[in-house]
Amino acid sequence: MIPENILHTSISHLRGVGAQRAELLKTELGIYEYQDLLNLFPNRYIDRTKFYKINELQNNNAEVQLVGKIVNLRTVESAHQKSNRLVATFVDETGTMELVWFKGLKWLRDSLKINEPYVIFGKLNFFGGTFSMPHPEMDLLSEFKKTGHSSIQPVYPSTEKLAKRNITNRVMRQLVQTVFEEIGYNFSENLPDTILTTMNLISKREAMRNIHFPTNQSLLTKASIRLKFEELFYIQVQLVLKNLLHKQKFQGQPFKKVGDAFMNFYNHHLPFPLTNAQKRVLKEIRADVGSNAQMNRLLQGDVGSGKTIVALMTMLLAVDNRCQACLMAPTEILANQHYQTISELLKNTGVTVALLTGSSKTKERRILDEQLQSGELSILIGTHALLEEKVQFQNLGLAIIDEQHRFGVEQRAKLWRKNTIPPHILVMTATPIPRTLAMSVYGDLDVSVIDELPPGRKPIKTLHQYENRRAETYEFIKREIDKGRQAYVVYPLIEESEALDFKNLTEGYEYITASFPLPKYKVSIVHGKLKPAEKDAEMERFLRNETQIMVATTVIEVGVNVPNASVMVIESAERFGLSQLHQLRGRVGRGSEQSYCILLTGNKMSNETRIRMETMVRTNDGFEIAEVDLKLRGPGDLMGTQQSGVLALKIADLVKDQDILKAARFQAIDLLKADPNLELPQNQRIAYTLNQLQRHKNLWTYIS
């Protein structure tokens, strides 16, 4: 077992480092202590088992290893002394090549031995019929045999600055070797024997040794699996513990009663029968709110899956239990729409609903505040205006947050403080989150998924067209308008970018108004620069079918509901991410008629763009699209900067290691179900490791 203090020794004390190198290692790689260096895992490996002959070399060989002799050394001078280079003629029994150096020439001339066998390794260049190798790694054959070089060599993360300061991969390997020698290759095991046996994992000691200095490919694979599992397991233990502690610590108001408000709506006002998925999710929510713990649940549902009905029925449970409920949306348009939908659904039920946004007038707000505090108002829908200090409820029992990734943690916390007993929290998102990402980012929330669309909905037909077929697309829109339908045309920008060949929204609007002339056609325009009132007025005109075409930027991405709209044209579709394209497509297909999404792109497309277009044409399944998006963009990008820190993994990869992540979560849940306080003797290693993680949080910043 390694004494704790050795691992936390400053890197500047390591033999071969010194003050200057220590500073570089800190700033460039975040290495402050021995432990940081040990946790800097190689990002790839070089197979040094194969030796080439010079006559076997090919132009496409990347990195090669040879044995031979230097028979000649010469300095090639140039007009600028700094550009001088040292060239060695290197031979084996099959041929000749050159070795080239551009710096450290004097030291090299003095050090290199003529006619002594060397092992050389490096990247090949081929020029003028001759192979050459710039700045090769070199060992005298006699030394190479003595040191017993690993046949598989690690390549560590590096930066331009480190390379310039001569902290090469070889230097990094040597530093890691030195740490191993100082700590004596001893590593404390931090996983219980039961998990090691169940998961067939090698020991921590064996894993650390073989991740840095693998004996063979089989042991390298085992080391990698062991360390990935360990990393993901401790993230999951933290998240599951957070969930358990939350349930112990925060009591919610138990909604024991299913009363008149819920049953009256269910029996007489439900617009269509609930899908099996909606029923399942409602059952999960009822189990949460019926207990004494505060609900903390994430509700995922693809566009049009019926999340609003589930949210409304949960709010009615609150009303039946003498509580108030609120629903917070990220934009005024979306808040308005929720209000209109829910007001319409609750008409003639006796349940009171109100809307609060930044545009609400002072007089309205005064009445609303009185009704909230008296308990006369049951449901409040609004934007972040709900968070203001002066918005006081008589008894807030449930807070629903729509598209929560648009709200910060502090904003969400303000909702908690609206009652002495924190309200139940239901977070909704129409942006499907891949399972692996949900497990890692929202692993402390309980997750429900509505994975079924209401019956009778026709799947949207998606087509990919090149821009030279725009005229055909417009003719198609005219035919749909003649049937009484409406269309969206979405552009990626407001102002034309000099760097990128975007369609300009204003130009597009002018082109469309020319193609769809008055009085037969009327066109609306909505973009981010309009004032909220102007934006709402344009949306209202479109909603009432006073205009047939809505030209817009992505402000219509979330939540806008116009059942009569049957065509979505996305201009410069290559400029949008998959998730955005899917959200935009979800603005149509909300009625019973067949809907269409047309993706217009330029002829030149990158491979990634091609995959995005093919995925959109192939499937309407938001979860499948989210998985493809995760593979294309990686987890950090997908979650945005707010969440990227959560996923700064050292060795695991959420895309490639999904099976390991699932196993790690299963083991964490299983273990904590049996021993939630980690008191059993066999779990003391875990308790100790968690304690260390809390003390040295900088090492594990990815644990939320």
Predicted regions and their residues:
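Inter-lobe coupling/hinge segments of SF2-like helicase ATPases
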Residues: 283, 294-614, 674
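Structural detector for short beta-strands of small beta-barrel domains
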Residues: 61-84, 122
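Upstream accessory/linker segments immediately N-terminal to the RecA-like ATPase cores of bacterial MutS
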Residues: 78-269
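OB-fold nucleic-acid-binding modules
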Residues: 40-67, 71
